[in-house]
Amino acid sequence: MDPYCPFDALDVWEHRRFIVADSRNFITPEFPRDFWMSPVFNLPRETAAEQVVVLQAQRTAAAAALENAAMQAAELPVDIERRLRPIERNVHEIAGALEALETAAAAAEEADAARGDEPAGGGDGGAPPGLAVAEMEVQIVRNDPPLRYDTNLPVDLLHMVYAGRGATGSSGVVFGTWYRTIQDRTITDFPLTTRSADFRDGRMSKTFMTALVLSLQACGRLYVGQRHYSAFECAVLCLYLLYRNTHGAADDSDRAPVTFGDLLGRLPRYLACLAAVIGTEGGRPQYRYRDDKLPKTQFAAGGGRYEHGALASHIVIATLMHHGVLPAAPGDVPRDASTHVNPDGVAHHDDINRAAAAFLSRGHNLFLWEDQTLLRATANTITALGVIQRLLANGNVYADRLNNRLQLGMLIPGAVPSEAIARGASGSDSGAIKSGDNNLEALCANYVLPLYRADPAVELTQLFPGLAALCLDAQAGRPVGSTRRVVDMSSGARQAALVRLTALELINRTRTNPTPVGEVIHAHDALAIQYEQGLGLLAQQARIGLGSNTKRFSAFNVSSDYDMLYFLCLGFIPQYLSAV
């Protein structure tokens, strides 16, 4: 059709024609009127039968999908196990490789330490034979020969004790009623331990005794966190600085110490200085922390710090702060008044950090207030060293040898030379002997120093597991009242923490999957807290020696000063019995 144009074409420049835009000028073809009425746009409605067929088809499809999903879910665990099996094998291989690497690294460190101790000399530079094994030799009592061990002195001696009993085995070896009680409690509370230890006929199991000694050695160790200094090293540095601040740097009878080994050799005089300083304070010293400000079931401090004032009540920490060994605790010096009270920051000068750099030179700072878990362990170590000094004071190791429960002659042929004195001062004569700290000095020089050189990360409870046993037993001997006499019939319930940690060590020997690390740390923390509390009780007692606590030490088979030395270092005193 012809378009309708209300306006005529207009002429513009250059004679071009165009149509003016207007709604009435819309050009379109004619649209069919019945277009939307065609059948394609008007389908008939579904009938009920057709709807039923559609619903049935949908239901059948859903059922088939569910069946396929169920079959796939049934096959899923098998497929997961098939995929995990090679991963587990790889993990076991990696664990074995890591263990081999750790062993190789430890051997390399020991070799480097042995080479580092070799004297720099001329010639071919070769070390004399036996130098590498000299570090593995210790001497506990001055009139006994040195003992050579492989990895762990108490454990190695246990093997020799049971081997020395011959065919009778462990049925003729006893260690005291305290160990018997712990073993019976372990069997009762943890029956699974019978799978890895031989408890037949009421014998003392060698496996159990090994696990128990390892648990005693672990009391003072810190398993949470990574540190470059041990609590034992920090304790020795603190004792030296206290002696230096109270006696002066030049008040030594011999040359000034230049190595950490020199400090270990002078531990007795440093401990005597600590005892004298605490004695001048007046009043009864408190070897306890603020329990209301410490975690109840956790030894480590969250974030490295406890609540303010939790540690300052301990007499050791208070003494170190009073004499300038420890700097001011965080928060003791107000920040707004620091310019008037502490203008040069002297209150925060840390001599321990400088001493660590001078004697250990490890390239790492040592600020005990920033790691209060280590500070707490350091104070416990100092307290334990003081207890050891009191236990060994004026000890007589030359008394009648028949009074000693431990006889090295039963274990080692020729351990006691024939020309040695078989009988010394005993009875009333032994009281006239005032050996002072001679036994402790010999122990530091011939036992502590070699063990420290072999393992600089060693802690005090690893050196003296017998002390840990005494501290754990200290609460059992606590008097109930001044006018009451109570017979203790308990079956070792106070040693639940020690029993649990020992049982975990025994159970892990037979488990494919070891106990979770968190459970082991929880058990260790409970034991460490009990050791700390018992140590405080033991340190506060006026008399802790063998003469005033015969019954307590008899539970550990200790009957003489000679036995006391070996018990502290080994953690047990073996005794042979005739077979039934």
Curated annotation (Swiss-Prot):
Interaction with major capsid protein/MCP as annotated region, ranges: 1-49, 1-50
Q: What's one GO BP annotation on this UniProt entry?
A: viral penetration into host nucleus
Q: Where are stretches of biased composition, namely Gly residues?
A: 119-128
Q: At the top level of its lineage, which domain of life is listed?
A: Viruses
Q: Which UniProt keywords apply?
A: Capsid protein, Host nucleus, Host-virus interaction, Viral genome packaging, Viral penetration into host nucleus, Viral release from host cell, Virion, Virus entry into host cell
Q: Which residues form the signal peptide?
A: none
> What InterPro entries does the entry give?
Herpes_UL25 (IPR002493)
Write out the ranges of the annotated region (Disordered).
108-129
The keyword Methyltransferase is annotated on this UniProt entry:
no
Q: Does the keyword RNA-binding apply?
A: no
**Compartments, as annotated in UniProt:** Virion; Host nucleus
Q: Name one GO cellular component term.
A: viral capsid
Q: What does this protein do?
A: Capsid vertex-specific component that plays a role during viral DNA encapsidation, assuring correct genome cleavage and presumably stabilizing capsids that contain full-length viral genomes. Participates in the interaction between the capsid and the tegument through interaction with the large tegument protein/LTP. May mediate the capsid docking to the nuclear pore allowing entry of the viral genome into the host nucleus through binding to host nucleoporins NUP214.
The entry assigns this protein to a family as follows: Belongs to the herpesviridae CVC2 protein family.
Assembly mode = Heterodimerizes with CVC1. Interacts with major capsid protein/MCP and triplex capsid protein 1/TRX1 at the pentamer vertices. Interacts with the large tegument protein/LTP. Interacts with host NUP214; this interaction might be essential to the capsid docking to the host nuclear pore. Interacts with host TMEM250.
The protein in question is named Capsid vertex component 2
Q: Which species does the entry assign this protein to?
A: Human herpesvirus 1 (strain 17) (HHV-1)
